Amino acid sequence: MSSIKVECVLRENYRCGESPVWEEASQSLLFVDIPSKIICRWDTVSNQVQRVAVDAPVSSVALRQLGGYVATIGTKFCALNWENQSVFVLAMVDEDKKNNRFNDGKVDPAGRYFAGTMAEETAPAVLERHQGSLYSLFPDHSVKKYFDQVDISNGLDWSLDHKIFYYIDSLSYTVDAFDYDLQTGQISNRRIVYKMEKDEQIPDGMCIDAEGKLWVACYNGGRVIRLDPETGKRLQTVKLPVDKTTSCCFGGKDYSEMYVTCARDGLNAEGLLRQPDAGNIFKITGLGVKGIAPYSYAG
């Protein structure tokens, strides 16, 4: 077993870092700070961070085949031109729910942008229940709604054979799976593949590795866990020196490094003293497994 190393690599004290995604072309890590309404791109070669400020909470960012990026801002699917910092609205959802916003999002293997919504929180993980829905933005900019009654739409990814969609609604305290039709984007046959243990707390962001195992960031649990979705067993736990771990992705030259985002919002003064790196970006090396490259939105 290789020796696992957890290091803080970017000290910016984000309020709620989320949605890390690796951009191979620029050797950069993209991520968002939801309540600060900023999308960040950290160049790991130059160690420079660029930011684009937007006009509403921004909950996820993804690569786009045409260049630039896509992001979920408020309740809008948007395209983002990084060079001139312009944002173009592609579609809107939940127009009847003024208190809603998007949360986590990710692009599927066919280039659709999946993202779900939730009610705006009154405190971290405190909100009006069952207000969210799961959507996807197709390459033609049409939107499909899959289901509603969601609490906090969160981590999502697809199996390596593209036949299973994995999904987290945080307050269910489970990781779920659906049968997935890559051609149509349809999902069906929802079932639970993992139930969180008490000390693992709230399941948040998620990514898959090159062996088909899932990695879940545990909000308030201060860890990422590796799961086998076929057996429902936890295979590994990697603890971090912060409680509010929010999401994870693989990156680096060969996708052998894991990047983890976290939050500081919700910590009191004592918590911030105890966790000076809350809100920073972490890198985990030595996991002995690689990730896969992220997919890009095809529209």
Curated annotation (Swiss-Prot):
Tissues expressing this chain: Mainly present in the liver. Weak expression was found in the brain, lung and kidney.
Cofactor requirements of the protein: Zn(2+); Mn(2+); Ca(2+); Mg(2+)
Record has Ribosomal protein as a keyword: no
Residues at the catalytic site: D204
Any one Gene Ontology cellular component term annotated for this protein: nucleus
A Pfam family recorded for this sequence: SGL
Residue(s) carrying N6-succinyllysine: K144, K244, K253
Catalytic activity, reaction form: D-glucono-1,5-lactone + H2O = D-gluconate + H(+)
Enzyme class: hydrolase
Regulation: induction: By calcium.
Disruption phenotype: Mice do not thrive after weaning when kept on a vitamin C-less diet. They develop scurvy, have reduced bone mineral density and brittle bones. Hepatocytes exhibit accumulation of lipid droplets. Mice display increased mortality after about 3 months, and their life span is shorter than normal.
Binding residues for a divalent metal cation: E18, N154, D204
Chief location: cytoplasm
A Gene Ontology BP annotation from the UniProt entry: L-ascorbic acid biosynthetic process
UniProt subcellular location: Cytoplasm
Keyword line: Ascorbate biosynthesis, Calcium, Cytoplasm, Hydrolase, Metal-binding
EC number: 3.1.1.17
Pathway connected to this protein: Cofactor biosynthesis; L-ascorbate biosynthesis via UDP-alpha-D-glucuronate pathway; L-ascorbate from UDP-alpha-D-glucuronate: step 3/4
SUBUNIT field: Monomer.
Function: Gluconolactonase with low activity towards other sugar lactones, including gulonolactone and galactonolactone. Catalyzes a key step in ascorbic acid (vitamin C) biosynthesis. Can also hydrolyze diisopropyl phosphorofluoridate and phenylacetate (in vitro). Calcium-binding protein. Modulates Ca(2+) signaling, and Ca(2+)-dependent cellular processes and enzyme activities.
Entry similarity comment: Belongs to the SMP-30/CGR1 family.
Protein name: Regucalcin
Native species: Mus musculus (Mouse)
